[in-house]
Amino acid sequence: MVEMHEGAGLPEDGEFLLLDKPLDWTSFDVVAKVRNAYKRGGLKRKVGHSGTLDPKATGLLILATGKKTRELSTLEGLDKVYDAVIRLGARTLSHDSESEEYGLRDVTHLDEGAVKRAASELEGKRMQQAPMHSATWHKGKRLYELARKGTVVTDRKSKEIVVHSFDVLRVELPLAYCRIHVSKGAYIRVLADELGEALGVGGYLAGLRRIAIGSYQVESAMRVEDAVARVLGQMQVTDQ
C-alpha cells in the first residue's frame, strides 16, 4: 500500500508552477499530469491553469494548485510574448498547420525589408475577429464545432487587442521568424494570416512558442516530468 504524509515542502495553500508545455499536449493534459501526481500520494488537490495553449504550441503555461487557483484570474490580463514561425505563400482554413494548405503563391520576390514593413503595420491598437477554428462561443456552440460542419459565421465576435510589437527576427523564405508581444486574448494565427494578406501571398502560423506571460519567463519554467517529480518530492510517499 502507498502511504502519504504531507512534508514540510508541500505548500499548505498551494503554489504557482511555471511549466514548459510540450508539443502536441493540450493544456489540460499538463494539468491532469500534475493533478495525478497528487493523487498518487493520496492527496486530492485542485489544479488549474491560466492562458490556454493550442496543442501545436509549446512554451510557458502557468499552473496553480490548491487555494492559489483563486488567484489565476489575476494573470488573465497580463501581456503575452510569443516566438512565431509564419509560413508565407500559402493559407489554411485554421490559420495554422492543423489544416491543409491552399492558395499557394510564389514568394521569391519578397525580401526581409518587405516582411518587416508589413509586420510593423500590424502593430498598435486594433479590433481582431475570432477565427472560425477557435473555442469562441456563437449562439450556444463553439466556432470550431461549426467550422467542422462547413459553416462560416461572418458576424463573429471582435475584440480590441494591442500588438505592442511585431518584430521580424529573420526571413528564410518561405518562413518568417518573428517575436510578437500582444495584449490578452490576441490570436497569433490571425496575425499570421493578416501578415500574409498584407504581403499579397497569404500566410499561416507554422510554429508557436510562448516565452513570457507578464514578468513570468519560459526560462524559469520546468518540464512536465520535473514538475511531477517536484510534487512527489514535496510529499513523503512510502510503500507499506
Swiss-Prot record:
Keywords (A to Z) from UniProt: Isomerase, tRNA processing
Source organism of this protein record: Chlorobium phaeovibrioides (strain DSM 265 / 1930)
Known function: Responsible for synthesis of pseudouridine from uracil-55 in the psi GC loop of transfer RNAs.
Name the record gives this protein: tRNA pseudouridine synthase B
Domain of life: Bacteria
EC number: 5.4.99.25
Catalysed reaction equations from the record: uridine(55) in tRNA = pseudouridine(55) in tRNA
UniProt xrefs under SUPFAM superfamilies: Pseudouridine synthase
Catalytic residues identified in the record: D54 (nucleophile)
